[in-house]
Amino acid sequence: MILYHGSNKEIDRIDLSKSRPYKDFGWGFYTTPYKEQALAMAQRTVRLFKSGIPAVTVFFLDDGVLNDPSLRIRKFDRPNTEWVNFVVNNRNMRPQDTNNPECNIDNKYDIVIGPAVDDDIVLQLRLFLRGLISIPDLKKTLKYKELTSQISFHTEAAVCFLTKAEVTHG
């Protein structure tokens, strides 16, 4: 499987300590199977930090890794209540709902796979957190949204399966 990582610089070696907090699936290294999504992230990162040039680093991941029983893998096939709670909990770095306190703050998962949150979805999540819309309303909004996908790596045990293939600049 080919995965892409968009940044404001080429990634020579994955260093999880350089990851930023408050991400969808917790502190980790994020990739996507979509080159266009990675390029958009690279361009956004350059604008945000006002430094570097858009770079998409290409990685190879053996498909069998996602079935490796020694890895703790969490997969969300679509946005649902579990996914919303998981993303909200990770973005706030504390469980928000005592009935569903699941998150990946402690890197209990080596790899997490699921829909990516964009700026429109962030707005909807904020409305939900403020109590202005309900989970069913949030899910209804997401139903008509074209979602992208991400695969995040949260531990050295997971990162070691990624092999750098190339870098493109855009």
Where are these regions (language model features)?
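Short, conserved beta-strand segments within well-ordered enzyme catalytic domains
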Residues: 3-5, 30-31, 58-60
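Extended catalytic/binding region for NAD+/ADP-ribose chemistry, centered on the ART fold
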Residues: 20-44
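Short, flexible loop/turn elements at secondary-structure junctions
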Residues: 8, 31, 35, 63-65
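Conserved NAD+-utilizing ADP-ribose enzyme module
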Residues: 23-24, 44-49, 53-170
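A short linear-motif detector with a strong N-terminal bias
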Residues: 8-11, 35-40, 130-132
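Short aromatic-glycine-(Arg/Gly/Cys) micro-motifs in beta-strand/loop hairpins
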Residues: 1-23
